[in-house]
From Swiss-Prot:
It is found in: Membrane. The chain crosses the membrane at residues 764-784. Induction: Repressed by NicS in the absence of 6-hydroxynicotinate (6HNA) or nicotinate inducers. In presence of 6HNA, repression is alleviated. It is a single-pass membrane protein. One of its GO terms (molecular function) is heme binding. It catalyses: 2 Fe(III)-[cytochrome] + nicotinate + H2O = 2 Fe(II)-[cytochrome] + 6-hydroxynicotinate + 2 H(+). It comes from the Bacteria. This is Nicotinate dehydrogenase subunit B. Its cofactor is Mo-molybdopterin cytosine dinucleotide. One of its GO terms (cellular component) is membrane. It comes from Pseudomonas putida (strain ATCC 47054 / DSM 6125 / CFBP 8728 / NCIMB 11950 / KT2440).
Length: 1187
């Protein structure tokens, strides 16, 4: 492991006594620069590569970092080989700016091919020196000495350890180009598979990842990003902040600071959860943002419309003449989508800006470039900044790892304490520099003899280096667009075309973008290899044979032949030659490439060839890559098994990119905010991978990391063509694209669902309240609009009631759910203030604690009982029937007295309820007198002598204390609960559907008494789902009741025999044409399946409800499902259920609509399709309700 803080720095080693140092003067690379900009030549510096210490340690240093590719192991093998050490005797240090040489960014798989060369020479230099020193001491020629495990051994048995040879002096040697390298025939480590040195520490939980790094006195930070995600240029960048209201989080515990520098806004707190909450609740005002991204609904056209600067990197023969004279012209366009680096863990960093020194623990891919950016940001010398590189959550390219380091530095500077910052998942996905889209256009064709007439290739690459975000937000750099010459990787095809022209269209980004694995080479090779496949079939020649005709590179020819042989390739000249297996079509595709990386003309890395086998379901359009045979020639393989690991990883990642990955945009903003909106390949979808590595141990090592992925897209697309006869020139090749290309045959996820019935459910009681007042006016002659005040009394003493009565009162209060409506989130129980939004205004629940001024402390029992039974307050005012006195009138006297005693014995809370905000005429309380005269019945509940005691107890609790009809019965035009067949037939409350309870045994998934009992007791039923919304706190209260009472409620409800709602018979199938069920399926698999896997996945946090039987999915209305998806279940009904996150900050209205439509189609296919889901999702998002 790289416990680099325990390793002396370069300066410490240079000053140390008892050490052999192998150094060299190097000129640090400048890093990528914009087109037309002259790179800044940095001063030469002394770089340290090898340190042999008298404490027995051998340190080796390389400026690149290990991204999970295993270079720490391979580099250690190289050093150990040259110095005849064991692997455990080499401490490999990577990337740390105070220790490792500045060898530039870790990109293009260039570590072993380029950056390891000086390290190997340094080890050879050290070996020669140590042998020379030993020869002098032992009095024998160096040829008579050998080295074993760090000890020099003479032929007579005399020994000297490395530590002894370097004692007492500081030996500094420059790398000697003439130092003899070990003969390949003598290798004992290089060329043999070695276990990864990093795996044991990761497997046993050693401190490895930057996310786990902690320091004493450390604080936690979070950042609030501006509204222009996806942009890194424009006048608004760094100039959009209006105000930050620090008072909005003044009440939160643990907040240390709010840091504002132009558009950079961050919060610092003592604990991480405090920082998260502060960032969420801090009120930040931004200027209205109108600078939207270009219209990316048509990415290809957006690229074509983007200004460009052309450069031709190859022009040979007569391209125009060849095209003009072609017997068959083929003009093709290929499109690569925007993709994410998709780091599994959001970027994280820890900065310590104290005592004049700045230290940053980072997962960066570019430590030295990051140090330069931070020096620019802080306007200080680079020497003050130390980057300590730790491993991160996986990224090949430029994600937000550097951005978050700058965030942490700014926050640490503000508070002068170490600060750890981690981005949210949404920030990582939205703000990371995307892997850019790329458009490749080819014009060419065939001659009459099947030879290539001409090849005119253009590639357009809208990307650049994506400046570190804090530099832009703080105004340290100007937000001007820049052109980077990075679209030319592997732009020249590997084939010998006589007439060929290659043109690069350099352009500024459409979206914040930067390099990603296979920078421009994967897209370019997708076009090259798809096009030659088309040429082969058009010429009537087998695709492998056709490639071989146009290859002259001997190693390429050997690889193509060997790979075809390994895969048992069957020559063919037409697609669809494999017998279909029912609805499954099978095909094979071939592709070859050599990755050419770095600044044009670049360097050639490893050669790679793919044979991909696919299965295509022509009914659903689903594509499975079932097997990949991959041939690979990387020259000398330092660690063959490590190379194999890299190839496997590349196959998996590139298959995911070809079949699934695409950033989605809505209204010109990034919509892929989490895994539901950006699906990646899952374990069940992995292909079988057969790796064939050509033995080339006498050849120089070539970069192998990215090379294996370069032919991937074309191989898979060519295989799909072989299976279906259809060419796909745009990625990803998703099921809906395949199904559409196949003519829409079959039943895919988008197949029509049954029709939506025309019947509509009634709304919350205010929905039709307008009719109340017209009727009430006609009743004023017989109803009293004003009632007498009942005089206030002195609050009863605390000891006025027995413990038994108080316990009975507690149970009555629990059964009546008093605290559910009379307590705000985070507030004192029963102190009121809960807002209840209605179409006609807002009501606020009252304070029912015994406070004499703001509560019911001066209410007599008579006043309390009148309010409960008649809806009249102590002062004579009418209450709105949102307070369910129409049910509470059923409560018997003993329970009413117990409830009064319980409430009056609670701790008083002085809290004035906000004034109701009802619009005229609904704010005229006297008008409720007529309503009461018409709909309020009198008297307590009377038991049914024909029924059991349990049934009667259940009816009493349901119709009285529990006031279930208040939510679960529909209302008439005057807002009163309907009876008869409509009793408990369902209703709406606070935007939630309260389902029908009067025919539970006849519902689509029948409720048994036991299921209902379990649900009411725990909030969960395996056959129906989880209690959410207003039902959650109801269950919480029911859980405190005697089990016999809950059983009585279940018994009573299960006995009801209402009429189940019938579906429209033989209705014409309808589908909401504005939703994509395929996209909904992807969202479900990416965001939901981990928990809702029908028992197939792990049980992690509480229950994992099945969507197949979820009542919300089978409901006539989508409201409850949408509310749970968007707002989650932040407070579960009982602790064992587990928390469900809401996705309102992660999924757009369209994505939520697609998800809901898919769930309905997948799990309730016999029900009518929901309509207008996107608008309904927007409505639910804007109106979260109070539950």
């Amino acid at each position: 492991m790289n416990h680099s803080q325990q390793v002396p720095s370069r300066d410490q080693l240079l000053a140390k006594t008892g050490v052999l140092l192998i150094v060299d003067q190097i000129t640090p690379p400048s890093g990528p620069v914009a087109k037309g900009v002259t790179p800044t030549v940095k001063e030469r510096e002394l770089a340290l590569f090898i340190a042999v210490s008298d404490d027995g340690m051998v340190y080796a240093f390389n400026g690149h970092v290990d991204l999970g590719t295993g270079i720490r192991t391979s580099l250690a093998q190289i050093v150990a080989e040259e110095l005849d050490l064991r692997m455990d005797q080499v401490h490999m240090v990577l990337g740390d700016t105070e220790r490792a040489p500045n060898q530039g960014a870790t990109i293009a798989s260039a570590t072993l091919q380029i950056s390891a060369v000086p390290l190997r020479k340094a080890a050879a230099t050290a070996r020669r020196y140590l042998l020379q020193q030993a020869a002098l001491r032992l009095g024998c020629p160096p040829e008579m000495l050998r080295i074993e495990d760090g000890t020099v051994i003479a032929s007579n048995g005399s020994t000297l350890s490395f530590a002894e040879l370097v004692q007492g002096k500081n030996h500094q040697l420059h790398i000697a180009d003439d130092a003899p390298l070990k003969a390949i025939e003598d290798y004992r480590l290089v060329g043999r598979s070695a276990p990864r040195v990093d795996i044991p520490g990761k497997a046993t939980g050693e401190l490895t990842y930057v996310h786990d790094m902690r320091l004493p006195n450390m604080l936690h930070g979070r950042v609030i990003r501006p509204p222009y995600a996806g942009h890194d240029s424009g006048d608004f960048v760094g100039n959009s902040l209006l105000a930050v209201d620090e008072s909005s989080i003044a009440h939160l515990p643990g907040v240390v600071a709010v840091v504002v520098i132009r558009d950079f806004v961050g919060v610092v707190a003592e604990r991480e959860e405090q920082a998260i909450r502060a960032a969420h609740e801090l009120k930040v005002s931004w200027k209205p943002f109108t600078g939207k991204l270009p219209d990316l609904s048509d990415v290809a056209q957006a690229i074509r419309d983007n200004p460009r600067v052309q450069r031709t990197v190859l022009d040979q023969g007569d391209v125009d003449g060849g095209i003009a004279n072609a017997s068959q012209r083929l003009s093709r366009s290929y499109l690569w989508p925007y993709q994410l680096h998709a780091s599994i863990g959001p970027s994280c960093a820890l900065a310590d800006f104290t005592a004049g020194q700045i230290r940053v623990w980072s997962g960066t891919q570019n430590p030295h470039l990051l140090r330069a950016d931070l020096a620019w940001l802080l306007a200080c010398d680079e020497a003050r900044i130390e980057i300590i590189r730790m491993e991160a959550a996986g990224c090949y390219g430029r994600n937000c790892a550097d951005d978050v380091c700058a965030d942490a530095v700014l926050l640490s500077r503000a508070v002068q304490r170490p600060v750890r910052v981690q981005l949210t998942r949404e920030q990582e996905h939205v703000w990371e520099p995307k892997g850019t889209a790329q458009l490749m256009e080819i014009d060419g064709g065939l001659n009459a003899d099947g030879s290539v007439a001409a090849y005119d290739f253009q590639t357009s690459y809208p990307s650049n280096g994506a400046p570190t975000l804090a530099l832009l937000l703080t105004g340290a750099v100007e937000p001007v667009p820049a052109l980077f010459e990075m679209g030319d990787r592997t732009s020249i095809p590997p084939y010998d075309y006589e007439h060929m022209r290659v043109t690069i269209n350099d352009m500024t980004p459409l979206v914040r973008a930067s390099w990603m694995r296979g920078v421009s080479a994967m897209p370019n090779s997708f076009a090259h290899e798809s096009y030659i496949d088309e040429l082969a079939f058009a010429a009537g020649v087998d695709p492998v044979e056709y490639r071989l005709k146009h290859l002259s590179d001997p190693r390429a020819i050997d690889l193509v032949k060997a790979t075809a042989e390994r895969a048992q390739w069957q020559p063919h000249t037409r697609p669809m030659q494999t017998q279909a297996e029912g609805d499954v079509l099978r095909g094979r595709g071939f592709a070859y490439a050599r990755y050419i990386h770095s600044k044009f003309p670049g360097f050639g890395a490893a050669w790679a060839a793919w044979v991909a086998d696919v299965a295509v379901d022509r009914r659903t359009g689903e594509v499975a890559v079932t097997r990949v045979v991959i041939g690979h020639d990387a020259g000398m393989m330092v660690n063959p098994e490590g190379v194999r690991h890299q190839i496997h990883g590349n196959v998996i990642q590139s298959t995911s990119r070809v079949l699934k990955e695409q950033v989605s945009f809505e209204e010109s903003t990034v919509a892929s905010k989490e895994w539901g909106g950006y699906p990646i390949l899952t374990f069940p979808e992995l292909p079988a991978i057969d790796v064939m590595m050509l033995p080339r141990q006498h050849e120089p090592p070539m970069g192998s990391g990215e090379s294996a992925s370069v032919p991937s897209a074309a191989a898979i697309a060519n295989a799909i063509f072989d299976a279906t006869g259809i060419r796909f020139r745009e990625l990803p090749i998703t099921a809906e694209r395949v199904r559409a290309a196949l003519g829409g045959e079959g039943q895919g996820p988008d197949a029509p669902a049954p029709a939506q019935p025309s019947t509509k459910r009634s709304k919350w009681w205010f929905g039709s309240l307008a009719g109340v007042f017209g009727a009430a006016l006609g009743m004023l002659a017989t109803a009293l609009p004003w009632r007498a005040e009942i005089a206030p009394v002195t609050p009863p003493g605390v000891g006025s009631w027995s413990a038994a009565m108080l316990e009975r009162g507690r149970q009555v209060a629990a059964a009546g759910d008093c605290a559910v409506c009379h307590t705000v989130s985070g507030g004192k129980a029963n102190a009121g203030g809960l807002a209840m939004d209605t179409p006609f205004g807002t009501l606020y629940s009252t304070n029912i604690t015994p406070d004499p001024e703001t509560g019911i402390g001066r209410w007599s029992f008579a006043a309390f009982e009148r309010a409960m039974r008649e809806g009249i307050s102590r002062d004579g005012r009418h209450l709105y029937p949102a307070f369910p006195y129409t049910s509470f009138r059923n409560i018997n006297d003993a329970d009413m007295q117990a409830l009064y005693a319980y409430l009056m014995s609670q701790t008083p809370v002085r809290q004035e309820a906000p004034a109701n905000q009802m619009r005229f005429p609904f704010n005229q309380r006297p008008l409720m007198a007529g309503w009461n005269a018409r709909f309020l019945q009198r008297g307590e509940y009377q038991p049914d002598p024909q029924r059991s005691a349990q049934w009667n107890r259940g009816a009493y609790l349901v119709d009285g204390l529990g006031h279930c009809t208040a939510c679960h019965s529909p209302r008439n035009l005057m807002g009163a609960e309907k009876g008869g067949s409509s009793y408990l037939a369902g209703g709406m409350v606070d935007g939630w559907e309260a389902p029908a309870l009067n025919a539970l045994g006849k519902s689509s998934t029948p409720w048994s008494e036991d299921e209902l009992f379990n649900y009411l007791s725990t909030g969960f039923s395996e056959k129906h789902g989880v209690a959410a919304g207003p039902m959650g706190p109801v269950v919480s209260e029911l859980a405190t009741l005697p089990k016999s009472d809950v059983r009585a409620i279940a018994h009573y409800l299960s006995s009801l025999e209402g009429e189940p709602q019938a579906l429209a018979a033989n209705a014409a199938p309808q589908v909401d044409t504005h939703v994509s069920l395929s996209n909904g399926e992807r969202v479900f698999k990416g965001a939901c399946l981990g928990c809702h896997s029908d028992g197939l996945g792990p049980k992690l946090f509480g229950v994992s409800p099945s969507m197949a039987v979820n009542s919300n999915v089978h409901s006539d209305l989508p409201d409850n499902l949408l509310r749970v998806v968007l707002h989650g279940i932040p407070t579960p009904a009982t602790r064992d259920l587990g928390y469900m996150p809401g996705f309102k900050d992660s999924l757009s209205d369209r994505q939520v609509a697609d998800l809901a439509a898919y769930l309905r189609h997948r799990f309730a296919a016999d029900k009518p399709a929901w309509q207008g889901l996107a608008s309904k999702a927007a409505q639910v998002r804007a109106n979260p309700g109070s539950h």
